[in-house]
């Protein structure tokens, strides 16, 4: 085991404990140091960071080498350690630089390999993203976790996205097919704004298992996705846009782990 931390009509929901058996964390609220940058509290050696600044269509990206460790990167506007609770904090405004295939700004981590190359894993095996977080503010909708399509075809869509809305509703969006633009939204919970909660996204063969606060839901991944490799993303990927730089989505993480087996 190495640590770096869909669509189906039928689904099942079962109770699971806390983060579940695979929900190990590399930091907890009790151990977070508010005086360290995020890389001092979290293992960011296997993540790069996309920011809502840069040139049009090319947001600034911070490498794992710059993020990791007690001397790691911090940004007082978009990516910092909360001085009160030590959380890794992401802010994505409504107006900001976006990637070529999106109209929304983000302050978001992208999974990488330990050697610095982009993570790009097959559906075979057991792949898990676990987090404890809380959404502090959001205008309309924010994606706080993703399973994104990598190589294997022309599509750049996500396989699945986890959304949080201002009323506390949490939705899991599953892509209908690699080439279709539509998602199917599944309501999977409700947590009031500002309250901590946990999620685990586990990809295991042709299944994707999603656990929120201990309740697990399983979806079958359509075979059309089999040629594609995947990678995880986590942070604040705002899902609304305007000319405002003061409105947006602020998300705080208290633990974040990636695990592959």
Positions of predicted regions on the chain:
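C-terminal region of N-terminal signal peptides and the immediate post-cleavage residues
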Residues: 19-31
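N-terminal module-boundary/linker segments of secreted carbohydrate-active enzymes
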Residues: 29-71
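Ligand-recognition surfaces built from glycine- and aromatic
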Residues: 41, 126-128, 222-261
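Secretory/extracellular carbohydrate-interaction modules
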Residues: 70-75, 79-85, 89-169
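Short tryptophan-centered beta-strand motifs in secreted/extracellular beta-sheet-rich domains
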Residues: 131, 195-203, 208-210
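Short, aromatic/His-centered strand-loop micro-motif at the edge of beta-sheets
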Residues: 174-198
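Short strand-turn-strand beta-turns centered on an Asx-Gly dipeptide
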Residues: 212-215
């Amino acid at each position: 085991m190495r640590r770096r931390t869909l669509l189906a009509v039928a689904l099942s929901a079962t109770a699971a404990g806390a983060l579940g058996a695979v929900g190990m964390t590399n930091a907890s609220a009790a151990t977070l140091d508010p005086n360290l940058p995020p890389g001092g509290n979290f293992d960011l050696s296997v993540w790069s960071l996309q920011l809502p600044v840069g040139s049009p269509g090319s947001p600034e990206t911070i490498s794992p080498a710059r993020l990791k460790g007690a001397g790691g990167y911090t940004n007082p506007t978009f990516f910092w350690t909360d001085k009160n609770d030590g959380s890794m904090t992401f802010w994505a405004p409504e107006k900001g630089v976006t990637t070529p295939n999106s109209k929304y700004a983000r302050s978001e981590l992208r999974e990488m390999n330990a050697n610095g190359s982009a993570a790009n894993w097959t559906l075979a095996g057991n792949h898990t993203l676990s987090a404890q977080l809380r959404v502090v503010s959001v205008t309309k909708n924010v994606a706080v976790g993703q399973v994104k399509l990598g190589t294997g075809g022309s599509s750049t869509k996500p396989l699945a996205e986890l959304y949080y809305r201002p009323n506390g509703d949490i939705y899991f969006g599953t892509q209908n097919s690699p080439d279709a633009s539509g998602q199917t939204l599944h309501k999977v919970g409700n947590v009031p704004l500002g309250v901590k909660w946990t999620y685990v996204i586990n990809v295991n063969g042709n299944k994707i298992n999603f656990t929120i606060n201990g309740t697990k839901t399983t979806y079958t991944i359509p075979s059309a996705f089999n040629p594609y490799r995947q990678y995880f993303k986590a942070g604040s990927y705002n899902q609304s846009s305007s000319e405002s730089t003061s409105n947006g989505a602020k998300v705080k993480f208290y633990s974040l782990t990636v695990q592959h087996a």
